[in-house]
């Protein structure tokens, strides 16, 4: 279990590990032939690493980051069901280094019964990203993450399991480790190695402004959004509030976009990119 702050390089850990394992370094011992670089996907070698990630936006970021590092990554999610068969063929042929799936896929009958057994049998590595979602003590508990336990239990002996998070306090970390350890060993006492670093970041600030009325909050945004440096995210409680807030801010001249469950998938991806590149002042999201 790796608990390190955002930007520490957790994704680099599993990307590098994937390459080393798929090229044969996991079995290498001094005095034996050195694995050949670029030999990923060789016959009889390890299959793709499986990364469980909770959000499509995170998956897109990880696929892009993997591509920049020369790693072949694909996703199987609710938005590309028609491509699942093609992706399965690519994985079976050793053409994929990393397969990203959402925890909800673990409860999909087709994925669970037809896809998952083959992945588990040959996986180089299993990664649970945003692992705080496993714990009901965590701020972002996802019930579907509880289904990861049976996946881990079904893995062949020796398949490494890595969990990563940037937002787990000590209690959440202990809960994650206990659950992973039980899934791995089938006993309450876990055998999980925990790497934990400082999570605070000096550039983050937290401020609280009490504005009980919706009109007051919108008025504050209209008056002060332009004074805030850079781009950011404005969170609202409902889809309608996000759309209404974005509409009012745009009418006032602010370059903002609504980002909700009703937003088209292509529009979401474009909005994410616009935010990262500071082409919009803010996304108004739920």
Segment roles from a protein language model:
Residues 1-22, 36, 41-49, 53, ...:
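Helicase motor core with emphasis on the C-terminal RecA-like subdomain
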């Amino acid at each position: 279990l790796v608990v390190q702050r955002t930007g520490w390089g957790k994704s680099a850990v599993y990307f590098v590990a994937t390459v080393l394992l798929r090229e044969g370094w996991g079995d290498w011992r001094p005095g034996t032939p050195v694995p050949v670089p670029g030999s990923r996907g060789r016959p009889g070698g390890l299959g793709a690493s499986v990364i469980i990630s909770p959000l499509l936006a995170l998956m897109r970021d990880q696929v892009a980051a993997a591509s920049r590092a020369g790693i072949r990554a694909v996703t199987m999610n609710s938005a590309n069901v028609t491509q699942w068969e093609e992706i399965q063929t690519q994985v079976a042929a050793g053409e994929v280094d990393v397969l990203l799936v959402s925890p909800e896929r673990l409860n999909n009958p087709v994925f669970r019964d037809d896809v998952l057994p083959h992945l588990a049998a040959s996986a180089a590595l299993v990664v649970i990203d945003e692992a705080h979602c496993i714990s009901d003590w965590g701020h972002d508990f996802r019930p579907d993450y509880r289904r990861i336990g049976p996946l881990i239990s079904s893995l062949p002996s020796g398949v490494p399991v890595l969990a990563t998070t940037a937002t787990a306090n000590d209690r959440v970390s202990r809960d994650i480790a206990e659950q992973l350890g039980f899934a791995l060993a089938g006993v309450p006492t876990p055998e999980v190695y925990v790497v934990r670093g400082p999570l605070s970041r000096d550039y983050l600030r937290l401020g609280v402004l009490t504005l009980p009325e919706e009109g007051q909050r919108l008025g504050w945004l209209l008056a002060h959004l332009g004074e805030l440096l850079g781009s950011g995210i404005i969170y609202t409680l409902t889809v309608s509030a996000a759309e209404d807030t974005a509409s009012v801010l745009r009418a006032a001249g602010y370059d903002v976009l609504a980002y909700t469950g009703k937003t088209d998938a292509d529009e979401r991806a474009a909005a994410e990119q616009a935010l990262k590149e500071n082409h919009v002042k803010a996304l108004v999201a739920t």
